[in-house]
Amino acid sequence: MKYVLSLDQGTTSSRAIVFDEKGNVVSKVNKEFRQIYPRPGWVEHDPVEIWESQIEVAKKAIEEAGIKPEDIAAIGITNQRETTIVWDKNTGKPVYNAIVWQCRRTAPICDELKEKGYSEFIRERTGLVIDAYFSGTKIKWILDNVEGVREKAEKGEVLFGTVDTWLIWNLTGGRVHVTDYSNASRTMIFNIHKLDWDDEILELLNIPRAMLPQVMPSSHVYGYTAKDIFGVEIPIAGDAGDQQAALFGQACFQPGMLKNTYGTGCFLLMNTGEKAFESKSGLLTTIAWGINGKVYYALEGSIFITGAAVQWLRDGLKIISNAAETEELATKVPDNGGVFFVPAFVGLGAPYWDMYARGLIIGITRGTTREHIVRAVLESIAYQTRDVVEVMEKDSDIKVETLRVDGGAVVNNFLMQFQADILGVPVERPVVNETTALGAAYLAGLAVGYWKDQEEIASLWQLDRRFEPSMNSEERERLYSKWKEAVSRSLGWEKR
């Protein structure tokens, strides 16, 4: 029997998961690595540590599954997106640490681009807003600030890659320098309509084309692992950014299908098919994946603070000792007691885009209890999700019929039920919650014929529980309009 190995390289840990042909988890190994903060607002990783931790867990996962490397039909890769690595082509050594997606050091470069009026130019071509989050300005920073790198880049002696590219390059012993459409679409230098690096943006940021990887479909045999790694050559056949991989793992193959990943923040992606919709509400237009000679697009909305607000209840207010308690506490009261919580700890993302908004708790009376505060925090996750779903429907003109969910918080039945109630559509929780790794496995398996087609994959998707909306529409709209009112009071607070 054959299996698929998924390498899930995340922001805080490297993971490897072995899946069988039914999409079930056979083994799973995780290893955390260092977060490096050289200055306030700067975040780095050591690329060598990323590679070493990833290969260590890969070998362990095969061992723990009780199988041999030759039993692996293909390897799929999924990764933290936007994080930028530049390395020497000849020695394979990084010229600088990986600059992580969270790193804000290039904000001044972004401000300058915006001041010069390039926002629309960048958005039309890349589907993105100008922000330090994306790879483009990070590459420029390395070229401008690390001695000797620019000269080498002009000669094609250094290479750029997002994390997937770095892993594939190392897995193939330096033979293959590629990325996929989904990861390329997060760099801010890739034209998502022409499906190529954008020469005018490269000129604007002064990035030599010679250092960039070849862009390929997300399901494709890119190359084979070097023999000295696993003792056999295994095809590397799937590659997608983490959020896009989760959309694929949730089998959201039809336009209008939508998933929400509940983590520290939330990421909503809606499949929009072969059409790239331009957002009027500050959502990102991104590539979902490239497969079978076609490219599929998605709208993406990110919510900064969701699970992080629950962590704040635990570590900041110390009114809970773990996240699991929140469900029981929230259900001890019949409603939120008029309390609303806006988790604008770092401003608000889509659709408000207000960096000066700050958190608030409003509606407090003498009768307010710990339970009401906890419930208000959980409810805020659902309200923020509705904020994004509403603008997605408006931008795409597609009505959402169901929401598929994954991530840590989906075990909270109260939250899932309230999410269905406040959206007015069913929420579907799958049996396999490892949707990101599963998506990468599916992409790899499809490329080597391990799975036949997307129909087969859609049939493997198993429902754990479906939450039907049970709230009447008057109550739903009453709560939601109160939420909107609470948000309006948090906006611009830092500047007032």
Curated annotation (Swiss-Prot):
Q: Name which cysteines form disulfide bonds.
A: none
Query: Does the record carry ATP-binding as a key word?
Result: yes
Q: Which InterPro entries match?
A: ATPase_NBD, Carb_kinase_FGGY, Carb_kinase_FGGY_CS, FGGY_C, FGGY_N, Glycerol_kin
What's an example GO cellular component term for this entry? Answer: cytosol
Give binding positions for glycerol: 81-82, 133, 242-243
Q: Which residues bind ADP?
A: 11, 15, 264, 307, 408, 412
Which keywords does this chain's UniProt record carry? Answer: ATP-binding, Glycerol metabolism, Kinase, Nucleotide-binding, Transferase
Q: Per the record's keyword annotation, is Cell division included, yes or no?
A: no
Recorded GO terms, molecular function? Answer: ATP binding; glycerol kinase activity
Domain of life, per the record?
Bacteria
Catalysed conversion reaction: glycerol + ATP = sn-glycerol 3-phosphate + ADP + H(+)
Matching NCBIfam families: glycerol_kin, PRK00047.1
* The protein's role, per its UniProt record: Key enzyme in the regulation of glycerol uptake and metabolism. Catalyzes the phosphorylation of glycerol to yield sn-glycerol 3-phosphate.
What's the protein here called? Glycerol kinase 2
Task: Give the species this sequence originates from.
Answer: Thermotoga maritima (strain ATCC 43589 / DSM 3109 / JCM 10099 / NBRC 100826 / MSB8)
- State the organism's lineage: Bacteria, Thermotogati, Thermotogota, Thermotogae, Thermotogales
